[in-house]
Regions:
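Short beta-strand edge/turn micro-motifs at domain boundaries
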Residues: 99-129
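A solvent-exposed, acidic/Ser-Thr-rich amphipathic alpha-helical stretch
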Residues: 6, 25-81
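Structural motif
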Residues: 35, 81-82, 105, 112
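Short, low-complexity N-terminal intrinsically disordered segments enriched in polar/charged residues
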Residues: 1-30, 34, 128-129
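A short hydrophobic beta-strand element
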Residues: 79-89
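Short solvent-exposed loop/turn micro-motifs enriched in small/polar/acidic residues
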Residues: 11, 67-69, 97-100
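Short, cysteine-centered beta-strand-loop-beta hairpins and adjacent loop/turn segments enriched
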Residues: 64, 90-99
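Hydrophobic/aromatic beta-strand elements that line small-molecule binding cavities or substrate pockets
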Residues: 70-76, 89, 101-107
């Protein structure tokens, strides 16, 4: 496992994580198209967010993130337009350290994320999605 590669998408992903750490929601939103769609399974039920205002509500959840560590288990990209990542995530919560696994897939248009599948693969309680 490791870090994102030194490719255009690798650098874009690193910037995305850095913006999350900085809690810079507006800059994160600037990485998405105006009509972007994000499908999330973080809450064990599908949540669909369309457009910047709904994405803004989704990303408000990052304000509570502390001590985020990302370890990439799988990285696949095609032509600066498609990206699939499996990440081992560790972060601090009020209850202690939470460990989980995500599978993120991005479809990019004009250098911005148009479609984002944000999938929880393993929940903090250890259950597999």
């Amino acid at each position: 496992m490791g870090d994102a590669p030194e490719t255009r998408l690798g650098r874009f992903y690193k910037e995305h994580i850095d913006l999350i750490l900085k809690k810079d929601i507006e800059a994160i939103l600037d990485q998405y198209t105006e009509d972007a769609v994000l499908i999330s399974s973080f809450e064990k039920v599908p949540r669909i967010f369309r457009g910047r205002e709904e994405l803004r509500e989704h990303f408000k959840g990052i304000l509570g993130i502390k001590g985020l560590k990302v370890d990439i288990a799988f990285w696949g990209e095609v032509d600066d337009k498609l990206l699939m990542i499996v990440e081992a995530i560790e972060l601090q919560t009020d209850e202690g350290t939470a460990k989980m696994r995500f599978a993120d897939s991005w479809v990019l248009r004009d250098g911005k994320i148009a479609v984002h599948f944000a999938g929880m693969v393993q929940y903090p309680d250890g259950n597999i999605a």
